[in-house]
């Protein structure tokens, strides 16, 4: 892992607008790194500096919100540098999980410093690993990133007994990660900023330790874990109940709790693909403009129906992402544009895909309906301004700016 990668590709949450980048940040490293201990004292009598992360609100499904965190550059550099200096030991620790599908893997061509979990690979592993098992336990951790106890970082890396005996920064690098994580969160011991890849790395450190603890207590762990989302397989109901108790205890040891609203006990085989996913994935748009127009209307009717039937699923988000792969006839652009703008009222999360389509067809020279876009997005902005919804406001303004549409005063 290179420090520049964590700064350029892993600092800002991916949900931020394209104009916000950290591409120039590595240029300050020659000046900052030699004086890092002066700028951010970690020893001696100098006063310690702490900073707060900036909150950026994004939508979740069913109207819920999530606050992403953008740390102060100095303390992000400090934490990222500590991670890079100990990258080999971190990789060794994180390689010990046999269930994770969200390893801290890097790739030079990736848009992020840490690769996202592969959905296709996860589905394949679920099928293979569930073979011969009768029961499935689905669990995830309640408010995971915001409830991580930073003192548990050295526990995960060095064991709790060792960490409590040696608490100073320079004795174990887990203590340094603990201290650096607190500095960018106003000195708090609970919570990591959601969005930066440093939080992904630290969360995986803790979760791998939990995976190891479960295996130690059960003798085996069969299943998959995607970040904090577990699918665990058992042969008997007794084994399932034992596994359930063990994971509760393992999480409690790290000051974490299960999300009881999402805990499910199911008999296998499991339905791998929801009906909406399969139907939308296989949907094809015909080339002739009149047939294609019918297909567009059918597609949106189908998607809206499924979105209302499965309000807890990302139906609209997946559907809008699929539109990227079709070149629509210019005669159908007006109706497609209207249907996309209407869909925003149901699910604001689709804004990036709506933006991609609107801006993409605008650059291709399509005759977009500026007045309709202006009216729809201005009303959208007014509505979300009253709610202080950062994501919706900034994305809608970005679309208008990219399309060179002036907003009303």
Regions of interest found by a model, annotated:
Residues 1-172, 176-196:
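Conserved two-metal-ion catalytic palm core of "right-hand" nucleic acid polymerases
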Residues 67, 71, 222-224, 257:
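Short, surface-exposed helix-loop/turn micro-motifs enriched in polar/charged residues
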Residues 11, 219-220, 256:
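Short aromatic/hydrophobic-glycine micro-motifs
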Residues 103-118, 158, 248, 253-256, ...:
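Short flexible/disordered coil segments
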Residues 79-90, 157, 210-214, 218, ...:
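Hydrophobic, Leu/Ile/Phe/Ala-enriched alpha-helical segments that form helix-helix packing faces
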Residues 124-227, 233-241, 290-409:
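Conserved polymerase palm-domain catalytic core
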Residues 237-298, 302-305:
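Polymerase palm active-site segment centered on the conserved acidic dipeptide of motif C
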């Amino acid at each position: 892992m290179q420090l520049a990668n964590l700064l350029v590709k892993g600092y800002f949450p991916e949900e931020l607008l394209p104009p916000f980048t950290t591409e120039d940040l590595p240029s300050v490293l020659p000046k900052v790194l030699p004086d890092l201990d002066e700028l951010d004292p970690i020893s001696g009598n100098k006063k310690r500096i702490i900073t707060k992360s900036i909150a950026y609100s994004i939508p979740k499904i069913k109207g819920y919100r999530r606050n992403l965190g953008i740390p102060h550059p100095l303390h992000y550099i400090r934490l990222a540098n500590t991670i890079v200096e100990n990258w080999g030991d971190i990789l060794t620790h994180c390689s010990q999980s046999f269930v994770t599908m969200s390893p801290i893997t890097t790739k030079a061509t990736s848009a992020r410093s840490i690769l996202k979990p592969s959905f296709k690979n996860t589905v394949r592993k679920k099928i293979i690993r569930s073979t011969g098992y009768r029961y499935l336990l689905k669990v995830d951790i309640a408010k995971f990133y915001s409830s991580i106890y930073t003192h548990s970082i050295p526990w995960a890396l060095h064991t709790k007994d060792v960490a409590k005996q040696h608490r100073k920064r320079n004795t174990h690098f887990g203590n340094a990660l603990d201290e650096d994580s607190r500095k960018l969160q106003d000195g708090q011991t609970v919570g990591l900023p959601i969005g930066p890849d440093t939080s992904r790395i630290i969360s995986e450190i803790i979760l791998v330790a939990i995976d190891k603890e479960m295996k130690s207590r059960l003798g085996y762990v069969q299943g998959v874990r995607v970040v904090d989302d577990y699918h665990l397989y058992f042969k008997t109901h007794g084994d399932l109940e034992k596994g359930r108790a063990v994971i509760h205890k393992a999480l409690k040891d790290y000051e974490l709790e299960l999300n009881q609203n999402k805990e499910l006990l199911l008999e296998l085989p499991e339905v791998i693909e929801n009906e909406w996913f399969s139907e939308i994935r296989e949907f094809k748009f015909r080339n002739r403009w009149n047939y294609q127009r019918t297909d567009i209307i059918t597609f949106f009717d189908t998607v809206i129906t499924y979105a209302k039937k499965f309000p807890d699923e990302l139906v609209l988000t997946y559907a809008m992402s699929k539109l990227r792969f079709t070149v629509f006839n210019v005669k159908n652009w007006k109706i497609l544009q209207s249907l996309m703008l209407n869909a925003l009222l149901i699910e604001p999360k689709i804004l990036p895909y709506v933006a991609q389509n609107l801006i993409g067809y605008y650059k291709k020279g399509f005759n977009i309906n500026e007045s309709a876009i202006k009216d729809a997005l201005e009303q959208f902005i007014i509505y979300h301004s009253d709610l202080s919804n950062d994501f919706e406001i900034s994305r809608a303004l970005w679309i208008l700016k990219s399309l060179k549409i002036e907003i009303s005063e």
